[in-house]
Amino acid sequence: MATKAVCVLKGDGPVQGIINFEQKESNGPVKVWGSIKGLTEGLHGFHVHEFGDNTAGCTSAGPHFNPLSRKHGGPKDEERHVGDLGNVTADKDGVADVSIEDSVISLSGDHCIIGRTLVVHEKADDLGKGGNEESTKTGNAGSRLACGVIGIAQ
């Protein structure tokens, strides 16, 4: 089992970053940390998408990683996509320092995120509470600013 993974985020604009993942036990939580720069100040949706395909930019990554066919939600919700990591918060300089621990994603097994795409979005994720159909699919997080395929790390 891989215990570490990394993702280099890039987009068409100024947004870029490096996100690290570490899972010490196969059924334990995954620590997610790193930094994203070039964002507007505020909240930005942060999700693992189904495919590791960036051939047409971030759009070819498909929908959120959702092997259990659930509705979109927040990272602490029972009803959520596996890939729903909530929001990252950018400061006035456009930098989001990421520090998350998640017990639904994994670096092995059915919820493995390796080979899938991590995406940072234009807007805040409403965590499935926006009151419309799009909220239950995407959290109304808007366009995909930057993305990268999650790969095994040393």
Curated annotation (Swiss-Prot):
<feature type="binding site">
    <location>
        <position position="84"/>
    </location>
    <ligand>
        <name>Zn(2+)</name>
    </ligand>
</feature>
<dbReference type="GO" id="GO:0042802">
    <property type="term" value="F:identical protein binding"/>
</dbReference>
<dbReference type="GO" id="GO:0043410">
    <property type="term" value="P:positive regulation of MAPK cascade"/>
</dbReference>
<dbReference type="GO" id="GO:0045471">
    <property type="term" value="P:response to ethanol"/>
</dbReference>
<feature type="cross-link" description="1-(tryptophan-3-yl)-tryptophan (Trp-Trp) (interchain with W-33)">
    <location>
        <position position="33"/>
    </location>
</feature>
<feature type="modified residue" description="N6-succinyllysine; alternate">
    <location>
        <position position="137"/>
    </location>
</feature>
<dbReference type="GO" id="GO:0043087">
    <property type="term" value="P:regulation of GTPase activity"/>
</dbReference>
<dbReference type="GO" id="GO:0008217">
    <property type="term" value="P:regulation of blood pressure"/>
</dbReference>
<dbReference type="GO" id="GO:0005758">
    <property type="term" value="C:mitochondrial intermembrane space"/>
</dbReference>
<keyword id="KW-0832">Ubl conjugation</keyword>
<dbReference type="GO" id="GO:0051093">
    <property type="term" value="P:negative regulation of developmental process"/>
</dbReference>
<keyword id="KW-0560">Oxidoreductase</keyword>
<dbReference type="InterPro" id="IPR001424">
    <property type="entry name" value="SOD_Cu_Zn_dom"/>
</dbReference>
<dbReference type="GO" id="GO:0005634">
    <property type="term" value="C:nucleus"/>
</dbReference>
<dbReference type="GO" id="GO:0048538">
    <property type="term" value="P:thymus development"/>
</dbReference>
<dbReference type="GO" id="GO:0005576">
    <property type="term" value="C:extracellular region"/>
</dbReference>
<keyword id="KW-0225">Disease variant</keyword>
<feature type="disulfide bond">
    <location>
        <begin position="58"/>
        <end position="147"/>
    </location>
</feature>
<dbReference type="GO" id="GO:0006749">
    <property type="term" value="P:glutathione metabolic process"/>
</dbReference>
<dbReference type="GO" id="GO:0005615">
    <property type="term" value="C:extracellular space"/>
</dbReference>
<dbReference type="GO" id="GO:0007283">
    <property type="term" value="P:spermatogenesis"/>
</dbReference>
<dbReference type="GO" id="GO:0060052">
    <property type="term" value="P:neurofilament cytoskeleton organization"/>
</dbReference>
<feature type="modified residue" description="N6-succinyllysine; alternate">
    <location>
        <position position="123"/>
    </location>
</feature>
<dbReference type="GO" id="GO:0005654">
    <property type="term" value="C:nucleoplasm"/>
</dbReference>
<dbReference type="GO" id="GO:0001819">
    <property type="term" value="P:positive regulation of cytokine production"/>
</dbReference>
<dbReference type="GO" id="GO:0009410">
    <property type="term" value="P:response to xenobiotic stimulus"/>
</dbReference>
<keyword id="KW-0449">Lipoprotein</keyword>
<dbReference type="GO" id="GO:0006915">
    <property type="term" value="P:apoptotic process"/>
</dbReference>
<dbReference type="GO" id="GO:0042803">
    <property type="term" value="F:protein homodimerization activity"/>
</dbReference>
<dbReference type="GO" id="GO:0071276">
    <property type="term" value="P:cellular response to cadmium ion"/>
</dbReference>
<dbReference type="GO" id="GO:0007566">
    <property type="term" value="P:embryo implantation"/>
</dbReference>
<dbReference type="InterPro" id="IPR018152">
    <property type="entry name" value="SOD_Cu/Zn_BS"/>
</dbReference>
<dbReference type="GO" id="GO:0099610">
    <property type="term" value="P:action potential initiation"/>
</dbReference>
<comment type="subunit">
    <text>Homodimer; non-disulfide-linked. Homodimerization may take place via the ditryptophan cross-link at Trp-33. Heterodimer with SOD1. The heterodimer CCS:SOD1 interacts with SLC31A1; this heterotrimer is Cu(1+)-mediated and its maintenance is regulated through SOD1 activation. Interacts with DAOA; the interaction is direct.</text>
</comment>
<dbReference type="GO" id="GO:0035234">
    <property type="term" value="P:ectopic germ cell programmed cell death"/>
</dbReference>
<feature type="binding site">
    <location>
        <position position="47"/>
    </location>
    <ligand>
        <name>Cu cation</name>
    </ligand>
</feature>
<keyword id="KW-1015">Disulfide bond</keyword>
<keyword id="KW-0523">Neurodegeneration</keyword>
<feature type="binding site">
    <location>
        <position position="64"/>
    </location>
    <ligand>
        <name>Zn(2+)</name>
    </ligand>
</feature>
<dbReference type="GO" id="GO:0032839">
    <property type="term" value="C:dendrite cytoplasm"/>
</dbReference>
<dbReference type="GO" id="GO:0001541">
    <property type="term" value="P:ovarian follicle development"/>
</dbReference>
<dbReference type="GO" id="GO:0051881">
    <property type="term" value="P:regulation of mitochondrial membrane potential"/>
</dbReference>
